[in-house]
Structure formats: C-alpha cells, structure tokens
Regions:
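N-terminal beta-strand/beta-hairpin edge segment
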Residues: 2-84, 92, 97-101
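Beta-strand elements of well-folded, non-transmembrane domains
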Residues: 8-10, 30-32, 45-49, 69-73, ...
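Extended amphipathic ligand-handling, pore-lining, and cofactor/metal-binding catalytic surfaces
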Residues: 77-89, 96, 118-161
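A structural signal for short hydrophobic beta-strand segments in well-ordered beta-sheet cores
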Residues: 93-94, 113-117, 164-165
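Residues that act as N-cap/strand-start positions at coil-to-secondary-structure junctions
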Residues: 98, 107-109, 159
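Hydrophobic residues embedded in beta-strands of well-ordered beta-sheets
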Residues: 100-102, 122, 172-173
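Extracytoplasmic/luminal low-complexity segments enriched in Pro/Gly and acidic/polar residues
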Residues: 136-195
Length: 195
C-alpha cells in the first residue's frame, strides 16, 4: 500500500494540463518492498516532464528516496530467503548504531555484518561469523548475503543508486537517488508502459 501527493488541487490541474509535475511525494506503508519484509520507502520526485519521444516518455529532474528497513523485517526477510533453515539461522536481529553493525543471531550461528554502499546498491559486509557444530567458509556466507542484498537493492530503474546507509536503534536507513533521468518507454521497461 502506498500514498501519493501532487501538491494542492489548482496547481495539480495545471501540472496535468502542462504534463510538468513539480513535486510528487510517495510513501509506502512499510509492509514489503520486493522480497524485503518490513521495508518502507519515502520518495520525493521533482521536476517531472512528460514528453513522448522515440527513446523516452520524458524526464525526471530529481528523485530522492529514504528507505527504512526494520530489524524485525530484516529477520523475516532472511528467514524467507533460506527456506526450512531460516528460523535456525536468524532467530533475532540486533542493531548496533555505535559501530554501524547488524547482528543476526540464530540457534546455529551468529553473524555481525556492516551495511555498506557497494556499486549501485547495498551489501552486508561480514565483520564476525561464528557457527555452532558445523563449518562454513566465511566467503560462502558472504556470497549468499551479497546475492540476497543485491536482489533487494540493485537494478532499480532510472539510474537510481544507493548514496548512504546508517544503522539505527530500530533497523537500517538508507538513501537512494537519481538526477536528470530519462523515463523509459514501455518497450524498454514494462513498468513505465502506462505513462
């Protein structure tokens, strides 16, 4: 579920007529984004100009997003990403704002990871990794975490990329943005086919 606002009504009518939207705000309820449970997005989109050309549907001057992912949502997401064993691997998530780490605690393991900006998205860089009763190479676990976070935070359209990430007492907050982005045609990206 999401809510959107376009400004006050008289100005909105003018924006629709001119196909130039100066300020759009969107906020999700915080239930889920992609496969990430407990994730909320607050978007501010500025200077949208709709104009059909062979290569685009128009342009977006600026898009800024604040993405909040709760500790409980991180736990549920990791559990869902590892069917059957998920609850054993991650039974709780504890955040440590002082050192910017997230601790994934399970019956069989304890992983301390630091969320970082990597490429255009985010990664959880393993700081400490302990297992009980079995041995897994740290590289294997790191690779699995990278695939998981990549599927959630990379490959956004419009050149949207991660700018920063911060661990808070309740989860993780990240900032994503793009500037002067061309809106793809429906053929280039089906998500934009009805613009």
């Amino acid at each position: 579920q999401a809510t959107a606002s376009f400004g006050v009504a008289p100005l909105l009518l003018w924006q629709v007529a001119t196909r130039h939207f100066t300020n759009i705000s969107v906020e999700t309820a915080g239930n889920q984004i992609r496969d990430a449970k407990g994730m909320q997005i607050k978007l501010t989109i500025q200077n949208v100009r709709l104009k059909n050309t062979p290569n685009s549907r128009g342009t977006i001057g600026a898009l800024d997003a604040t993405i909040t992912w709760s500790s409980e949502g991180i736990k549920e997401s990791v559990q869902n990403a590892i069917p059957i064993l998920g609850a054993f691997v991650t039974s709780s998530v504890v955040t440590h704002p002082a050192d910017g780490t997230v601790e994934l605690k399970g019956l069989l393991n304890n992983i301390t990871a630091k969320p970082i900006v990597a490429g255009k998205g985010l990664e959880l860089q393993i700081i400490n990794f302990n297992t009980l009763g079995f041995s897994l190479p740290k590289e294997t676990v790191q690779s699995t975490l990278n695939e998981f976070t990549s599927s959630l935070t990379k490959n956004y359209p419009l050149g949207i990329h991660a700018d920063s990430v911060q661990v808070t007492s309740t989860g993780v907050v990240s900032r994503f943005s793009t500037r002067d982005a061309a809106i793809p045609t429906g053929i280039q990206n089906p998500c934009f086919s009805h613009i």
